[in-house]
């Protein structure tokens, strides 16, 4: 029996605002517990929320970037439930009329492109955080309570764990490029809820779905879904029935574990939020936001390939983040060769950032200085080997590469009039190497070049050295 898989993803993205969705409390990651709150977050009687217009605008920005239809007149709803991290006993969200509907993203898996539909996007407030400690007590931190979120709900178009991974990566890139969110799973600004069901091919109705929790990375999402897919198939093949469950991914055991069985759908008793007015979105507001959106990563990738001849893989790496993409474009705008700029960013720059665990904006390197160094290589002022010394300087200090090269005497020696006497001296002292080369031992030329580079402290231009060396050997 063959099966088909259906996967649904609900992605919560934390919007990058200075204050919360319905209160003036600050939004700052990593602060002491319960220091970023006020009476609205705590749900004190008589206090009234107010809508953060900036947060809603960021939500519209995300919706437009995902090709969604923006709802022109909507309202907020109360989702009623009790939990320690929700002191109001309800969450303000959008149920009946979400911010946007009918969006889509295009993914690519194994060279094949596919559109994944987005059913809806809605803006809501986040809950606080329960912390279970070793002393036997559970504590509540409400710093996160009220943080603005946009929830992105996929249509049932995802049919494999690989597609789910590609969808999340594409979604992360698109949202990150808008600037609406940092979308960092490690900081909680992007969280994923998943559900999966399988059914025999040809069956009209969907199978029974299970939810999977504790998915803290895209790799965990992919691996957890892959395990659950096989588990459900095995249950059906053995004649059993899949139960509606919530399961937890164990990354060490590489399996999902039962948390609880769900007997029916949750009843949150939604009703319109009485303390907030409706939200009217004008066409001008939508148009202004649309005009402010940057070129999306997919279009940038294609432009890099077509306009600058960047290989497809490299173009994909350069557009992983808007910061890297903008830096690359700015470097080229400063006159650097596009392929050389790409190579340096993907190689030495990325290597340094990964080794130091920092981001591009946290180092001293500027597009102008990187372009300046690439020009010095291109015109022969410095060698590729010297460039690595220059790079270490300009990525750690705000240093002009041209000025620094001249101050340190690192200019490449390319003048034949200065190189020829040095080469002649080396040849005079190494007749055996000349004889070996003429006898067909090509490695002898490498020895001679090495001696010349040693004599010039690595500053001789290897290309010019080889030209003079071959000419001099022929005359001997």
From Swiss-Prot:
It catalyses: L-glutamyl-tRNA(Gln) + L-glutamine + ATP + H2O = L-glutaminyl-tRNA(Gln) + L-glutamate + ADP + phosphate + H(+); L-aspartyl-tRNA(Asn) + L-glutamine + ATP + H2O = L-asparaginyl-tRNA(Asn) + L-glutamate + ADP + phosphate + 2 H(+). Belongs to the GatB/GatE family. GatB subfamily. It holds the Pfam family GatB_Yqey. The keyword rRNA-binding does not apply. This is Aspartyl/glutamyl-tRNA(Asn/Gln) amidotransferase subunit B. The keyword Cell division does not apply. It comes from Lacticaseibacillus paracasei (strain ATCC 334 / BCRC 17002 / CCUG 31169 / CIP 107868 / KCTC 3260 / NRRL B-441) (Lactobacillus paracasei). Its EC number is 6.3.5.-. Allows the formation of correctly charged Asn-tRNA(Asn) or Gln-tRNA(Gln) through the transamidation of misacylated Asp-tRNA(Asn) or Glu-tRNA(Gln) in organisms which lack either or both of asparaginyl-tRNA or glutaminyl-tRNA synthetases. The reaction takes place in the presence of glutamine and ATP through an activated phospho-Asp-tRNA(Asn) or phospho-Glu-tRNA(Gln). One of its GO terms (biological process) is glutaminyl-tRNAGln biosynthesis via transamidation. GO terms for molecular function: asparaginyl-tRNA synthase (glutamine-hydrolyzing) activity; ATP binding; glutaminyl-tRNA synthase (glutamine-hydrolyzing) activity. SMART domains: GatB_Yqey. Heterotrimer of A, B and C subunits. Keywords: ATP-binding, Ligase, Nucleotide-binding, Protein biosynthesis.
């Amino acid at each position: 029996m063959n099966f088909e898989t259906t996967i649904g993803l609900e992605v919560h993205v934390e919007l990058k605002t200075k204050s919360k969705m319905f209160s003036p409390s600050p939004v700052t990651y990593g602060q002491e517990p319960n220091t970023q709150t006020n009476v609205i977050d705590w749900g004190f009687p008589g206090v009234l929320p107010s809508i953060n217009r900036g947060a809603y605008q960021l939500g519209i920005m995300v919706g437009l970037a995902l090709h969604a239809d923006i709802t022109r007149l909507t309202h907020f709803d109360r989702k009623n439930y009790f939990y320690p991290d929700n002191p109001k006993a309800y969450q303000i969200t959008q149920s009946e009329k979400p911010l946007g509907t009918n969006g889509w993203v295009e993914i690519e898996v194994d060279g094949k492109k596919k559109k994944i539909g987005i059913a809806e996007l809605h803006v809501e407030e986040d809950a606080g955080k329960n912390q279970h400690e070793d002393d036997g007590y559970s504590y509540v931190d409400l710093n996160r309570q009220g943080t603005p979120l946009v929830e992105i709900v996929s249509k049932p178009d995802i049919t494999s764990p690989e597609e789910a991974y590609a969808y999340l990566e594409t979604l992360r890139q698109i949202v990150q490029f808008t600037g609406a969110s940092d979308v960092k799973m490690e900081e909680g600004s992007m969280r994923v809820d998943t559900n999966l069901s399988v059914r025999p091919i040809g069956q009209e109705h969907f199978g029974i779905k299970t939810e999977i929790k504790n998915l803290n990375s895209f790799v965990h999402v992919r691996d957890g879904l892959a395990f659950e897919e096989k588990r459900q198939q095995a249950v059906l093949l053995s004649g059993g029935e899949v139960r509606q469950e919530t399961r937890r991914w164990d990354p060490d055991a590489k399996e999902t574990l039962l948390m609880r069985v769900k007997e029916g759908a949750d009843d949150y008793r939604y009703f319109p939020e009485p303390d907030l007015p409706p939200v009217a979105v004008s066409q001008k507001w939508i148009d202004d936001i649309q005009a402010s959106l940057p070129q999306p990563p997919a279009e940038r990738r294609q432009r890099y390939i077509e306009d600058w001849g960047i290989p497809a893989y490299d173009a994909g790496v350069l557009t992983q983040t808007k910061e890297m993409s903008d830096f690359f474009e700015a470097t080229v705008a400063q006159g650097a060769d596009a392929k050389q700029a790409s190579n340096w960013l993907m190689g030495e720059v990325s290597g340094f950032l990964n080794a130091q665990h920092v981001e591009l904006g946290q180092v001293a390197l500027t597009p102008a200085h990187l372009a300046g160094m690439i020009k010095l290589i291109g015109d022969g002022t410095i060698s590729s080997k010297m460039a690595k010394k220059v790079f270490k300087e300009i990525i750690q200090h705000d240093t002009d590469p041209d000025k620094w090269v001249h101050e340190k005497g690192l200019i490449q020696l390319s003048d034949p009039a200065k190189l020829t006497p040095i080469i002649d001296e080396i040849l005079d002292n190494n007749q055996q190497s000349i004889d070996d080369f003429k006898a067909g031992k090509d490695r002898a030329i490498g020895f001679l070049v090495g001696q010349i580079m040693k004599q010039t402290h690595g500053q001789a231009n290897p290309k010019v050295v080889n030209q003079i060396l071959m000419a001099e050997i022929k005359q001997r």
